[in-house]
Structures are given as C-alpha cells and as structure tokens.
Regions:
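Short secondary-structure boundary segments
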Residues: 89-91, 185, 252, 338-339
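C-terminal helical cap(s) of enzyme catalytic domains, especially alpha/beta-barrels
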Residues: 95-115, 259-277, 340-364
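Alpha/beta enzyme core
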Residues: 76-81, 139, 146-147, 154, ...
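Alpha/beta catalytic cores of nucleotide-metabolism and tRNA/nucleoside-modifying enzymes
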Residues: 2-44, 280-308, 318-423
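Thr-Gly-centered strand-to-loop micro-motif
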Residues: 64-65, 312-314, 336-337
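N-terminal capping/small domains of soluble enzymes
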Residues: 2-167, 351, 403-423
Length: 423
C-alpha cells in the first residue's frame, strides 16, 4: 500500500502535528495555522473519491458481500443510492450444493436481559453463499456492467480445493466484465465442511497454494478476505500478498453462538429445534475489527510499503465516524453489509455526510489526507510504561523548578521559565 499510512512518521501532537507534517510526504501544501483556515483561504468541499488498485470509486463505501448484493435488483439499488462499489454475494460453480435454512439470523440487543426495545448490537447468521445458479449470477453481473460501466462491481468467489474448478470459475466470472475479485477465504460456517472459506484462510500452506492458482489465472485485481478466527491475522494476510493478491479485506464474521432460549432451552437461531455456530457481525464486532485491521496495516506498512496494495475495513460500520476509524488505521475502503440489512441502502448518504463532517472538522480535503494517521500511536505496553514514567519525571521536574543552568532546554524553555515564576 503505497500511501501516507505506510510512511515513517514521528509526530508529537496527534492532530496539529500531522497537518504540519503532511507536506513532507508529497501531499498538498496549504496555508494553515493548526487546523484553522485563514481568511484568505476558501475551504473546499471534502472529496470522498478514492482510487484503489486502479479502480476509481466516488466514495470509499462498499457494499459487503452478502444479502445486500444477492441479485441484480438489489445491486442496482445500491448503485442508484450512491454506494462507491458493490461486492456481490459469494458465488461458486455448483449452487446446487448450497442449501440454506430458515430462520438463519439471530440478534443481540443491549439493555436488561436483551430487551426487545434495546438497540441491536450483535447479529449472527448461519447463511451460506449464493444458492442461485452461477449462470444466472453471471448474466446479472454482465447486465449491471452494461448499465453502470463507470461503477465498480466486485465478484466474491469461493471454490473447493480443486485447481481446475478455481480456474473455470475465474474465467467465467471475468468474462462478465467485473472489475475485481474478492476471494472468500473466511466464511466460518457451513463452507469449511467442504474445505472452503475459513478452512483455507486458517491454513497458510493451503492458502498459499490456492492464491497461486488464482493469481496465475486472474487478470483483474484480487482481494483476499481474511478470517478473524485465527490467532494472528497478519500471517494469512502476508501469505496472500506474497502470493500475488493486490488487496486484503478484513474482517469476515466471528464464529459465535448467539444465545440460548431460556424457555425452550434451545440455541438461537433455532431450526427444527437445533442450531449450529454461525458468523457474528454488527456493532459489537467493531472494536475487534479495528484491532485486526490495525495489525494488518502495520504489517503492510512494514513489509509492503513500496507496493500499491490496498486494505478494505469491515466490521460494525453504521456511521461515518465508524468508517473514519478504519481509514485512520490505513483502510482505503470500508465495507458495510449488516448495516445495510438493518438500515437500508439509503444509509450511504448518512455515511458520506458524517464522514465529510469529520473531514471538515479537521480540514482534510481527501481520504488520503488522513488515511493511516493513527497507526503511529500504537506501540507496546512496555513502551507505554516507559513513556508514562518519562512524562511523570518531566512533570515533577517542571513543578520543582530548574536546579541549575545546565537543566535549561530549548524545547521546554517557556514552561521552564514559568516553573520559576512566583505569581
């Protein structure tokens, strides 16, 4: 990911210093005092557009793979509402093997005993990939690209451990004109039973082999979607990038059991009296997703800073501020799936407005102005202890006053002077 987020930045003030440092990294110079715009400078409307792996999007908000991208009608709606890109629901060669059940969702609410009036903070699904015939989905991909040639349509694909099957799927999907692939290496339920989804994403040797097949065949950008159900998410992300993928998407859902009905003693969602662990999403996963994305971004900054790789953040995005957090941690784009299921496709307008408000507050003109800006403030706990001990030492010294002429420093000269004033 060749961007500011992977530059080596050492700043003291987390906001004002970042603005002053930006010109050092080839970004736009402007006349600023801190973040207050001078009277002679007219503030421009923030530009939300992004270019990722050569793909131009009007904003960084992407429909995540799932029900919001399940057919032509809903994907058309997403484009009409103004989403930056759409990732279709995952397809494979043989949809006949995909059999869904109902109910397939369960919700977790905040409040006393999960009151029905409480805010929805968690969402579990046991839904599989697309159960529609591949040929039908391919026709709809082609139709969408014909009707929206300037909009970005990304195909999410998944196959069994079979090189020929992967090659056939890639070839057939590419012929529709889609702009990129997102490889589903991360679905935590159902598909791993067929050595698909997370079964590949959790096995780095298997992942390396399959990524090799995919990238030898694909002629459009490839993103690898990571599973959070692993000890160190940077390991498969590194393997995917080293094996030819141009981008990483993280995270997919977290393996979970939503709860037990205390009247029936049966798990939720309950299908004929039984259930199975599923994928957890929505607001409650947001902090976990931020940590995973932060770790991936730091790895990419350290090991792939010269490459034009991308990072797509996923997990609990319902506001523009949620999105800003992912971008501050290095994400180029932000995906929304459960949020659309809860609030509708019109959510994108709110996301754009709130992200622009954040950018105006800090006088950021583009996404690149602040992408990755917060990465530098993550360190080890050992380093935090050292920093705090030093800060306490300095505060004590200032309160005590200077003991000798040798104690004067240039950096804290004014404070040092004030420390010896009596009134």
């Amino acid at each position: 990911m060749a961007s500011l987020s992977f530059a080596q930045i050492k700043l003291k003030n987390p906001v004002a210093d970042f603005a002053r440092a930006r010109p050092e990294f080839g970004l736009r110079r402007s006349r600023r005092v801190g973040f207050r715009v001078l009277a002679s400078e007219t503030q421009k409307e923030p530009d939300l557009s992004v270019t990722v792996n050569g793909l131009h999007m009007p904003n960084p908000f992407v429909i995540g793979s799932g029900p919001p991208g399940t057919n032509y009608t809903v994907m058309k709606r997403a484009f009409d509402e103004g989403w930056g890109a759409v990732i279709a629901k995952t397809v494979s060669l043989d949809a006949a093997k995909v059999i869904n059940v109902t109910p397939r969702y369960a919700r977790l609410r905040a409040g006393v005993n999960g009151s029905v009036k409480g805010q929805i903070i968690g969402w579990e699904n046991i839904e599989l990939i697309s159960d529609r015939p591949l040929e039908t989905m391919l026709k709809e991909f082609k139709q969408l690209k014909e009707e929206y040639p300037d909009r970005i349509l990304i195909a999410s694909i998944m196959e069994e451990y079979n090189k020929a099957a992967w090659e056939e799927l890639i070839d057939r999907v590419e012929q529709t004109g889609v702009d990129a692939f997102e490889i589903n290496f991360s679905c935590p339920h159902g598909m791993p039973e067929r050595k698909m989804g997370a079964a590949v994403g959790q096995d780095c040797a298997l992942l390396e082999e399959v990524c090799g097949w995919i990238n030898a065949k694909a002629t459009i950008p490839v993103w690898a979607k990571m599973t959070p159900n692993i000890t160190d998410i940077t390991e498969p992300a590194r393997v995917a990038l080293n094996s030819g993928c141009e981008g990483i998407a993280a995270i997919n859902t977290i393996m979970s059991v939503m709860g037990i009905n205390l009247d029936s003693l049966r798990p939720e969602p309950c299908v004929e009296g039984y259930s199975t662990p599923g994928g957890y999403s929505s607001k409650a996963v947001h902090p976990i997703a931020l940590a995973k994305v932060m770790n991936i971004a730091k790895m990419m900054k350290s090991e792939f800073s010269e490459k034009d790789y991308s990072l797509s953040g996923i997990g609990g995005v319902e506001t523009g501020h949620d999105a800003a957090e992912f971008i501050l941690l290095g994400a180029n784009t932000v995906q929304v799936c459960t949020g659309v299921m809860m609030h509708g496709y019109c959510l994108v307008k709110k996301l754009c407005d709130e992200l622009k408000d954040f950018m105006r507050k800090h006088n950021f003109q583009s996404i690149e102005d602040f992408r990755g800006a917060s990465l530098q403030y993550f360190t080890t706990h050992t380093d935090l202890v050292k920093r705090q001990q030093e800060a306490i030492k300095q505060r004590k010294a200032i309160r005590k006053g200077l003991q000798s002429d040798k104690d004067w420093t240039g950096d804290g000269f004014v404070k040092e002077t004030e420390s010896m004033v009596s009134n």
